[in-house]
Amino acid sequence: MKSRREFLQLAAITSAIIGSRSFSSVAAKQSLSQNELLQFDSKGQVTLLHITDLHGQLKPVYFRPPSENYGVGDFEGIPPHLVGNEFLKHFNIKPNSSLAYAHTMVDYVNLAREYGKLGGLDRTSNIIKQIRAERGDNKVLLLDGGDTWQGSYTSLKTQGADMVSAMNLLRPDAMVGHWEFTFGKDRLAELLDEMQYPFLGGNVFDTEWDEPVFEAIKFFERGGVNIAVIGQHFPYTPISNPKYMVEGWSFGIRPEVIQKNINKAKKKGAEVVVLLSHNGFDVDQKLALTLEDLDVILTGHTHDAIPEAININNTLLLSSGSHGKYIGRIDLDIKKGKV
């Protein structure tokens, strides 16, 4: 059986093995079937699944990992700011393997010819269904980290409707956003009405009354555990995108608001607190160092794909890549209210 770390790596690249192409010579040598990829020892009472930054990609794609990823100050030379052979060495990944292809640009062109495209929402759906079947729906939370509706021809032509329809079939439990706001407030409202799950974001306020625009916290019971999910939309939306698209709304990181919502969640009996964030990895590393009683941060925006969660000040930080290539998973074992 696979360990949790191995599963996080293998689930990330399942699409390379079960994609539209038949097994190539390299893939065949890996001797990995979908069933083998999903063999692992589940732990604890709760499974968190994380997908983020799909950017409208319904079908498998070629998406080359970066050759540069600069970290500043204390973040230089540590995940996610590792690329190529340094990344492979740090995570003990074999060169020319499916994991090497999924996570680095090393010999990318040749490996792309061998392994083919990655991703595809149908393949993502298959993996999620199998995990839910193995664990039981009552133990699994599926969370969408945003940048889901925008980035493809079909999402442009349908103004996001294609992605909302597709994601409804996956049945996420909550979502946050960034490029979703670029459809404008009116279209955003229409799409939110079509969604069958909450659009959480505690860091957006209206500029007239300074009141929250969106629901900040959603409570779930999974595996007999009370879980609070706090949403965090991209804090720089009015700067990175045209401000008129979100006129009348104020964004920001607002760490004091996050801490307030964490405290509120704990007072209401949350045994696990999860921040579903589109801040970007380094911003969320900083938050993990300063916020109290936060158990997990599922981060997005920066498209970093890391094959295991990073523990920062007793907060697990997981980044699940982009464009449908990866699914992040964390199993949580909660005892006496502690993870």
Regions found by a protein language model. Give the residues of each.
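Acidic, metal/ion-coordinating pockets
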Residues: 2-19, 23-339
